[in-house]
Amino acid sequence: MTTTRTLFKGGIILTLDADIPNLSVGDVLVHGDRIAAVGPELQADDALVIDAAGHIVMPGLVDAHHHMWLGVMRRMMPNVDDLFDYIDVVAEKLGKHYRPLDMYLSTRLTALASLDAGITTIIDACHNSRSPEHTDAALDALKESGIRALHMVGAAMDKEASSAHLPADLERLSRSWNTSDSLVHVGLF
């Protein structure tokens, strides 16, 4: 199996590392999913070369708290004054109608928008894990997007929701997703 190497050439390098200086013009060599080298005039004959001149090259950002299942509802209530009014509408009135496909689409939309904004790692605080199928759909969306994620499984917030499936489901999910080679992991919210 060959691992892809990518060389970003001539970019403005922000290392975010006290031991590696920023460069006004420099290169970054990525091997697979890891930064292999940072410096001026790097060479890698077998690498895909991307001209980064005039662009900032830096490690991906981390979003430590996001409710990705709400992605399709963003900007729905921009002028809400009371958080509890928002929760009432989202959790009590809308969230309970989500199907697994809705979880997939919303989570995928949010993951791709995050990647587009430079966020490569995210903690997804999901409080709409209505069933194992809902959780599987959200996890599939995260995996397919390519983002690194910790999906925090949480009970749905509406009065009719049941969380009885969560203890057994969390064991199943942990066995399936919490492996050393997975970009997506599972925890409890």
Model-predicted regions and their roles:
Residues 2-4, 46-47, 53, 117-120, ...:
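Short coil/turn connectors at secondary-structure junctions
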Residues 92-129:
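Hydrophobic alpha-helical hairpins/lids featuring a short glycine-rich hinge
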Residues 26-27, 48, 186:
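Extracytoplasmic/periplasmic beta-strand context in beta-sandwich domains
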Residues 72-103, 146, 159, 182:
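Active-site gating loops and adjacent loop-to-helix segments of metal-dependent hydrolytic enzymes
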Residues 128, 133-189:
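Metal-coordinating catalytic core of metallo-dependent amide/deamination hydrolases
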